[in-house]
């Protein structure tokens, strides 16, 4: 009997559109797709002949704007039946809580969630897929879909990049999605597999491990496309000259009139400059003292690394205060801003002032050398960032606030309860990093991953399919899609082989 594959495809994961094409040629089966896409690509996706889908759905077409006949009993039963904490996801949805164009009411949020849950159940009941193929979720709605599939026993083959960018992995259950075993501190499938894994080679020295990390830290190949100021301006002109009907059809674009978008952009430019000026004046770029330091690395606000993975730690200024309260008296806390926060116009000045006015805190400029800061510190703390892994390579213990794909390493302590933070910090400060633990993690990742740069393949997709446009609501063409397939065939071959191996295992 043929296997059934359901793919979740959005504008940033068109590699799954290509994957479906190549998998059909390799192993056959029935293929279905849910598209989370804007209006203009729909015509191509409905009419295309490149990939044979037995049936497709467009997510946004099943979420109506004026649906207010709420069925809270259904939502309550859905939550109980599948053990999915809906408000935990909805209350941290960035489109709901960080939206500068539209204020969603409680009833609107519940209405959207109800329609999503009913739509997902209907699709799964209709086709009964054996596998779901998707990227790691980044919003409440694809996380609900992911968790629903897992709860119903459907194998979700989720593609994600590892902490070594040129390698990717296909996992059937991510450790950081706050399932019941995570919430109750039970061991995840990943942790159990890691414990059972045995090292097959001699442990490298710290010097050799650091060399490995540097060689596997940045992308091994580049892309010949990048956005120029001229291209940015042309994109803006293209946006203002096109139809904007999507704001009435897709809830994620509610309130985004061209007038509002234009003035929001102007406001963001001035806001970013004011905040940047404040940072330049108040944040240190270099630490000359030789005191005892603990380093906390801020995450970018409104990103899934905090909103989904660490739902109860999104107020990072409060996290800083809790760390300060828990430090041994001889330590000072260094707090480094994330360089990518500038893409979101930095944080509010009053947040920075609150940080600066906190006792025993030194604010560190985003351009400061992170490696040097780690070397000066006795412990490195973050919500979930990859820099904690870097710290281990530099022989510094780490402390993380949520489950990650590296938090099972013994030299990384995880916060189980905030009231235990003081003890956890003291325990972490006593850790002497063991190179054998790093070696095991490297070998474990290499064993469970394959050579494929997900980020670079995405950049190639943006270049060929979108023609380099910064807009997502543009028309697709068979010519552009074929160019993407042909120009990146080697990458699709790697991806297809990995999925065939996973499905066959």
PLM regions and their residue ranges:
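Conserved N-terminal ligand/cofactor-binding loop architecture of enzyme catalytic domains
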Residues: 22-120, 161-273, 493-494, 498-504
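A donor-sugar binding/catalytic signature common to diverse glycosyltransferases
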Residues: 135, 160, 366-413
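Active-site donor-nucleotide binding/catalytic segment of nucleotide-sugar enzymes
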Residues: 288-317, 322-324, 337-341
């Amino acid at each position: 009997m043929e296997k059934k594959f359901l793919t979740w495809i959005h504008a940033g994961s068109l590699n799954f559109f290509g994957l479906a094409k190549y998998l059909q040629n390799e192993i056959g089966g029935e293929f279905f797709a849910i598209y989370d896409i804007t209006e203009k690509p729909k015509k191509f996706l409905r009419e295309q002949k490149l990939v044979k889908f037995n049936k497709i759905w467009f997510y946004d077409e099943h979420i109506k704007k004026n649906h207010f006949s709420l069925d809270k009993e259904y939502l309550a039963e859905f939550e109980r039946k599948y053990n999915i904490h809906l408000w935990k996801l909805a209350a941290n949805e960035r489109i709901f809580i960080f939206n500068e164009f539209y204020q969603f009411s409680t009833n609107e949020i519940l209405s959207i969630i109800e329609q999503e849950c009913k739509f997902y159940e209907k699709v799964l009941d209709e086709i009964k897929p054996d596998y779901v193929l998707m990227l790691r979720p980044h919003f409440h709605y694809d996380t609900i879909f992911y968790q629903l599939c897992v709860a119903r026993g459907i194998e979700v083959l989720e593609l994600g990049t590892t902490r070594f960018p040129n390698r990717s992995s296909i996992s059937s259950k991510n450790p950081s999605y706050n399932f019941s075993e995570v919430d109750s501190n039970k061991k995840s499938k990943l942790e159990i597999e890691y414990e059972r894994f045995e090292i097959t080679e001699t442990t490298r020295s710290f010097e050799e491990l650091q060399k490995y990390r540097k060689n596997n830290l940045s992308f091994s190949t580049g892309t010949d496309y990048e956005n120029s100021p001229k291209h940015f301006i042309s994109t803006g002109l293209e946006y203002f000259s096109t139809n904007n009907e999507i704001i009435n059809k897709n809830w994620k674009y509610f309130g985004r009139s061209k007038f509002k978008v234009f003035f929001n952009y102007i406001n963001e430019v001035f806001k970013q400059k004011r905040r940047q000026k404040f940072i330049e004046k108040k944040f240190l770029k270099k630490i000359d003292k030789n005191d005892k330091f603990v380093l906390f690395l801020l995450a970018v606000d409104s990103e899934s690394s905090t909103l989904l993975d660490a739902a109860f730690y999104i107020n990072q200024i409060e996290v800083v205060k809790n760390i300060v309260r828990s430090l041994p008296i001889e330590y000072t806390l260094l707090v480094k801003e994330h360089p990518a926060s500038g893409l979101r116009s930095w944080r509010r000045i009053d947040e920075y002032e609150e940080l600066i006015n906190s006792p025993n805190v030194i604010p560190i400029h985003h351009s400061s050398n992170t490696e040097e800061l780690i070397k000066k510190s006795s412990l490195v703390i973050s919500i979930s960032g990859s820099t904690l892994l870097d710290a281990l390579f530099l022989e510094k213990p780490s402390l993380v606030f949520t489950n990650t794909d590296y938090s099972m390493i013994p030299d990384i302590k995880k916060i189980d309860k905030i009231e235990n933070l003081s003890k956890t910090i003291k325990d972490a400060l006593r850790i002497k990093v063991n190179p054998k633990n790093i070696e095991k993690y490297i070998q474990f990742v290499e064993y469970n991953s394959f050579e494929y740069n997900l980020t670079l393949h995405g950049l190639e997709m943006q270049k060929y399919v979108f023609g380099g446009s910064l807009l997502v609501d543009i028309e697709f063409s068979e010519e552009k899609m074929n160019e993407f397939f042909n120009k990146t065939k080697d990458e699709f071959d790697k991806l297809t082989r990995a999925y065939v191996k996973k499905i066959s295992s």
